[in-house]
Swiss-Prot record:
Entry protein name: Fatty acid metabolism regulator protein
Taxonomic path: Bacteria, Pseudomonadati, Pseudomonadota, Gammaproteobacteria, Vibrionales
Function: Multifunctional regulator of fatty acid metabolism.
A GO-annotated cellular component: cytoplasm
Domain of life: Bacteria
Oligomeric and partner information: Homodimer.
Annotated GO biological process: fatty acid metabolic process; regulation of fatty acid metabolic process
Listed HAMAP family: HTH_FadR
Location within or outside the cell: Cytoplasm
Organism, scientific name: Vibrio parahaemolyticus serotype O3:K6 (strain RIMD 2210633)
Keyword field: Activator, Cytoplasm, DNA-binding, Fatty acid metabolism, Lipid metabolism, Repressor, Transcription, Transcription regulation
Domain HTH gntR-type intervals: 6-74
Gene behind the chain: fadR
Amino acid sequence: MVIKAKSPAGFAEKYIIESIWNGRFPPGSILPAERELSELIGVTRTTLREVLQRLARDGWLTIQHGKPTKVNQFMETSGLHILDTLMTLDVDNATNIVEDLLAARTNISPIFMRYAFKANKENSERTIKNVIESCEALVNASSWDDFIASSPYADKVLQSVKEDNEKDEAKRQEILIAKTFNFYDYMLFQRLAFHSGNQIYGLIFNGLKKLYDRVGSYYFSNPASRDLALRFYRQLLETCETGQREQLPVVIRHYGMESAQIWNEMKKQLPTNFTEDDS
């Protein structure tokens, strides 16, 4: 087992998760005692205790006072955030996870957008317009750096879009443009979900954010993906402005089908880091 981590806690967390996944600590089993496990992993008991508590919160483990720590049937006890972890563990199934994500978004979007356009029409229009303006400025800018220099939302973008220390300038531009476009795509769906008035829809997107960023940062490296998304955003704006909410299922389903066609081509040449754990 080769594990890359930036800290002892990160190493311990990955060690335990991979051991659960690979059957060393299978679901339903009991973890070794704290002292034994800390020596096995090579971290302090304090660090291990913090990691175990975090994994328990995430649904991997059940900690009971005075009893051994039990490994859960994690697919029954974990939330949406586990999907990004599964991308790094189950590499052969990664494209299926992406397709599940796209299908789920297509299925729920007509529901929350209809509510958003009815209950929060003005805020919904503002959100879509801001995303369109920002994405148009991004794709028309001479470089990502020029876009950031002129963007009124630069601070927010830079909080989410991180540099990868890419030395090749052309690749750096491609990576940053894709990440930034994805930042706005996520913003559009997540904010419209909250505009619906049902916070559950917004929280679903919060739970998917890490996976969304992983997928979108690759998907939006394709100019065709960005062009298609912008056309979709403009259709959404028109639908919101005219009040023709009954058109939403058709508009969203059509976008889902077209974006799936692009993805089906892109998944044939996935980058080597697509399923890497970068934490």
